[in-house]
């Protein structure tokens, strides 16, 4: 396996182009944390892929499924499916951790503060090869990312 390090690569100061994508991603994560928390009694008993699929069916409408919380599709129109699934995984992982910490706290002597569910997380989207970026379109030193720019992906 070939490992690539980017310590010696100078990045241009163009991070502002990432801000709209990051802002949308973080708002979507907050929405999902809040929504999934209200449905945790049903979601918490599921595991793995069935948990993710159920969570996605709650927020995303398809031709075969009417979402219970259709506001997600209205607030985040045209959100790419890989980002939506990443948002769902991050939100579910955050809630799983919170409820695990809460259970541990309840089973302990409760000498520390009760865990608090954070709704606004500073999470960043992960750009996976073939899904969110393409190396084949450019030279060896470039990457083409799929970002939210000018109100479109």
Predicted regions and their residues:
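Nucleic-acid substrate recognition interfaces
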Residues: 1-153
């Amino acid at each position: 396996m070939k490992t690539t390090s980017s310590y010696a690569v100078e990045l241009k100061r163009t991070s502002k182009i990432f801000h709209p994508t990051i802002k949308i991603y973080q708002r979507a994560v907050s929405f999902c944390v809040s929504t999934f928390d209200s449905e945790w009694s049903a979601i918490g008993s599921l595991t793995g892929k069935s948990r993710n699929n159920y969570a996605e069916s709650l927020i995303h409408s398809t031709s075969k499924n009417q979402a219970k919380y259709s506001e997600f599709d209205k607030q985040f129109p045209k959100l790419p499916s890989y980002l939506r699934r990443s948002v769902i995984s991050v939100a579910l992982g955050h809630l799983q951790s919170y409820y695990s910490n809460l259970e541990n706290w309840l089973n302990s002597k409760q000498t520390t503060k009760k865990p608090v569910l954070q709704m606004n997380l500073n999470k960043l989207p992960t750009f996976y090869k073939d899904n969110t970026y393409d190396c084949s379109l450019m030279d060896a030193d470039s990457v083409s990312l799929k970002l939210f720019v000018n109100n479109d992906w």
